[in-house]
C-alpha cells in the first residue's frame, strides 16, 4: 500500500494536548530526539515528528489490515479504558482494557481454556440453564461469568495470537510489551517523555495521560485499520 495522507493536522494535535510531556526531571534521555523544548519544568514534544511517526504507523496498520492481519489494543489505565474499548469495537479489533493477565500471550493455551469456559458459561446462561441450578451454585457461576467478561470480554473472539499489538501506555503495560517481544509480535506504542522508544517497534511520541490525546491517536490508527480492511483483496 502506498503512503498516504491520513488527515493528521498539527493544530488538532495541539488542541488535543498531544505535545505535553511529563516533568523534565522524570524524562527518559532516549526520548530526546522527540522533545522540542522544556516549558515550566514540563517537556514539550515535537508534534511534527509525532505527525510523521503516526503517519508511518497508519501506513503500517492499513497495509496489515488489507492483508487480513488481526490487531489487539491494550490500555488498562482508568482514563483510557473506555476509549480503548470503543476504538477497538469501531475497527473490529480485540482489546484488553481492565487488567493484563500475566501470560495472556505467552501462555496462550491457558487463556484459550478460559475462553472456552467463558463461552460455555455464557451459552448456559443464554439457554437458561443457570436458572435450573441451586441458588448458591448459580450465583457462583454468575460471578465467574462476570469476571471472565470483565477481563477477557475484549478477546472473547480472538482465536489466535494477534499479529500486531497497539499499546496506549508503555509504563503501565510493560508486561504486555515483554510478552510481545518474547513472541516477536510487532508493537505500536504511544510513548511519553518518560518512556523507552527502543522497547517498541513503532513509537508514537504523545501525551499518554490526557484522554483527548489518547482518543485522537487511537482514532487515526483505527481509521487506518478500517480503510485497510476496505481495501483488502477478496479471494
UniProtKB/Swiss-Prot annotation:
It comes from the Eukaryota. InterPro entries: Ribosomal_uS2, Ribosomal_uS2_bac/mit/plastid, Ribosomal_uS2_CS, Ribosomal_uS2_flav_dom_sf. The keyword Chloroplast applies. Pfam families: Ribosomal_S2. Its main location: plastid. One of its GO terms (biological process) is translation. One of its GO terms (cellular component) is chloroplast. It is found in: Plastid, Chloroplast. One of its GO terms (molecular function) is structural constituent of ribosome. Keywords: Chloroplast, Plastid, Ribonucleoprotein, Ribosomal protein. The keyword Chloroplast applies. PANTHER family: 30S RIBOSOMAL PROTEIN S2 PROKARYOTIC AND ORGANELLAR (PTHR12534), SMALL RIBOSOMAL SUBUNIT PROTEIN US2M (PTHR12534:SF0). Belongs to the universal ribosomal protein uS2 family. This is Small ribosomal subunit protein uS2c. The gene is rps2.
Amino acid at each position: 500500500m502506498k503512503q498516504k495522507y491520513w488527515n493528521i493536522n498539527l493544530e488538532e494535535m495541539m488542541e488535543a494536548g498531544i505535545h505535553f510531556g511529563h516533568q523534565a526531571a522524570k524524562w527518559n534521555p532516549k526520548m530526546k530526539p522527540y522533545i522540542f523544548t522544556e516549558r515550566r519544568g514540563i517537556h514539550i514534544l515535537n508534534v511534527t515528528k509525532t505527525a510523521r511517526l503516526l503517519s508511518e504507523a497508519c501506513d503500517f496498520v492499513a497495509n496489515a489490515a488489507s492483508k487480513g492481519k488481526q490487531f489487539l489494543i491494550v490500555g488498562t489505565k482508568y482514563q483510557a479504558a473506555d476509549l480503548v474499548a470503543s476504538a477497538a469495537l469501531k475497527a473490529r479489533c480485540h482489546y484488553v482494557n481492565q487488567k493484563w493477565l500475566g501470560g495472556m500471550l505467552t501462555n496462550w493455551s491457558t487463556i484459550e481454556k478460559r475462553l472456552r469456559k467463558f463461552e460455555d458459561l455464557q451459552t448456559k446462561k443464554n439457554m437458561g440453564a443457570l436458572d435450573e441450578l441451586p441458588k448458591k451454585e448459580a450465583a457462583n457461576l454468575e460471578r465467574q461469568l462476570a469476571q471472565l467478561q470483565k477481563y477477557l470480554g475484549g478477546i472473547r473472539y480472538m482465536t489466535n495470537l494477534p499479529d500486531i499489538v497497539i499499546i496506549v501506555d508503555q509504563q503501565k503495560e510493560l508486561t504486555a510489551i515483554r510478552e510481545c517481544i518474547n513472541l516477536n509480535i510487532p508493537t505500536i506504542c504511544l510513548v511519553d517523555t518518560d518512556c523507552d522508544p527502543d522497547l517498541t517497534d513503532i513509537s508514537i511520541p504523545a501525551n499518554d495521560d490526557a484522554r483527548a490525546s489518547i482518543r485522537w491517536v487511537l482514532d487515526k490508527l483505527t481509521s487506518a485499520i478500517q480503510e485497510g480492511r476496505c481495501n483488502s483483496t477478496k479471494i
